[in-house]
Amino acid sequence: MNFSAKEKERRHSSFQNILKEYGLEALLLIGETAVGRGLFGDFRYYTNNRTIFYRQVAVVFAESEPVLFAGDAIQTEAAAKMSFIQDCRRISGNLAADVLGLLRERGLSKGRIGVNTEMLPTAWFLYFRKELPEIEWVESHEAIMGLRFDHSPEEMEVYRKGASLGDGGFEAALEMIKPGVSEYEVTAQIEQYARRLGGDEHFTLIASGKFILGNESSLPLVYAPSERIIESGDCVTLEITP
């Protein structure tokens, strides 16, 4: 997303405030391709960078510039162009070792480091604890969520655009839904509409089937689209999240 330099600085300053408030030497932000409340949002919020494969890691320091480990050459080049972080590095093949090397490079062998513990792999934690026994790992996700809920005017415009894309996707679905059309075709129409107008993430769910009021049959529960063909008399339910 194309956020301004002012928005970048606002987020960076907010993260620096967390570092000071909680007495942290650094924040470890882990991004991956999963979907969920805390499962990459902190990372993307700070870096403005999408993870398209495996994981990426950003380390935000209290006393020096942040670093982003972005992946292979393709992902690193993309991060250098699009992320908020200038120092973007390739992953060597062992991301945890890369992070450890960076912490040692910055002279960080003791103190407190914030991390979303739900995102921190057990293997990484055991490795870091062995190599950096004087580091205390501190849960930081809820503090960062507080920042993410405090929306700037620029962010509010993005949310308004997302709402508009959702409305337009619903209208596109109405034009497509009819007997003989598959769930795949309906969701493709929704996502094509949003993608064409700038939607870069899609979480589109659908279900179709018979629903009779008062009958034991329940309203179809939305899930990932399938090849199921919509039939006459079906009810179609949707979740549209561009």
Feature roles, as predicted:
Residues 31, 117, 240:
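Glycine-rich, N-terminal phosphate-binding loop of Rossmann-like dinucleotide-binding domains
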Residues 32-34, 119, 210:
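Acidic, glycine-rich active-site loops and adjacent beta-strand->loop/helix elements
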Residues 53-60, 166-171, 232-233:
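Short, basic, helix/turn surface patches
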Residues 27, 113, 236:
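Receiver (REC) domain switch-region micro-motif
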Residues 36-50, 131, 140-146, 150, ...:
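Short catalytic-site patches enriched in acidic/histidine residues
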Residues 6-12, 20, 94-202:
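Flexible, acidic/His-enriched mid-domain "rim/lid" segments that flank
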Residues 1, 119-120, 241-242:
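Short, charged beta-turn/beta-strand-edge "cap" motif at the junction between a beta-strand
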Residues 1-101, 222:
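N-terminal accessory/capping or targeting/presequence segment of soluble
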